Amino acid sequence: MSRRKRTGGAAPPPAGDARAAERPALRLVPTTAGEDRAEDHPSRWARPNLRSVVIASGKGGVGKSHLAANLALALGARGARVLLVDGDLAQANLDLLLGVHPRFDLQHVLRGEKSIEEVLVPGGRNVTLVPAASGVPELADLDDYRREVLLRALGQLEADYDLMLIDTASGVSRQATSFCLAADDVVVMTTPEMPAFSDAYGLIKLLQPQGLARAPHLMVSMAASEEEAEETAHRIRLVARRFLRLEIDSWGWIPYDPALPRALRRQEPVLTAFPQSPSAAAYRALAERLWETPGGEPERTMPTTPERLQA
């Protein structure tokens, strides 16, 4: 994907928020003035400063959790305060990727045994992990009430963070859909392989009529080259435009990199285990585009997502 530098004015911090004036600003798609998405969707988070980004995929094994963990660390290294949420409630793995060992997790919150603050785990580099459980069948399919409890619990943490980054379960579970509908931005990950391509489009097709805050973004991983990644993204965007009347922008691509499974075996993020690897460089470049540094350099912004085409 081309990496163009764009310039533009950052929104001023709220009056009286000295911390907001001192820290950089996340440069995703700007929120429409006066827009109140919480009224449009009862489970949507309503907060002035925190941005929420969900990383989703139609199938497993596309590098979604690697993106969540390493992007969180790369943004944290640039000064962002990141709340990293393991949204795969029954098959959690972000703790393994970060090399941390939580004592409590979201199952304890949902059972009323712990508050959301009590399960937080430092993940390094300004990153705080909200861990989930693994191998707990009751968390695989939460009822509506417990999903709402979970979303509201996460919303209580908004004042202490700049970004909530959520790694959802793969596929089209109700949990994953709920996270997507509650967030500001949804990133759909795919690989150039046809099954992943097909499932990514299927996920977009499922989410599109349900009321996303805006059109999803696309991320291609495990690509052999930039050309292969661009071709994959182009095909999905073309199909979405033709059949869903939906314009999708691209976040970029992550190259195929043997360092990723090696880092996982070491229970370390690739950013720290192999900082000179191609994938680590790609995660840092993505963080640089997402997070502007005050003074000196031009702002780096994500491309503005076009509005949905009118029927």
Give the role of each language-model region.
Residues 67:
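Hydrophobic positions on the alpha1 helix immediately C-terminal to the Walker A/P-loop
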Residues 58, 191-192, 216-230, 253-260:
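G-domain G4 guanine-recognition motif of GTPases
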Residues 1-62, 80:
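Extreme N-terminal, non-catalytic leader segments
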Residues 242-271, 283:
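Beta-strand-loop-alpha "switch" segments that mediate conformational coupling across diverse proteins
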Residues 57, 84-159, 234, 258-269:
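P-loop/Walker-type NTP enzyme "switch/lid" segment
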Residues 265-311:
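NTP-binding/hydrolysis catalytic cores, primarily Walker-type P-loop NTPases
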Residues 156-159, 173-194:
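Inter-motif core of Ras-like GTPase G domains
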Residues 74-83:
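Post-Walker A helix-loop "phosphate-sensing" segment adjacent to the P-loop in P-loop NTPases
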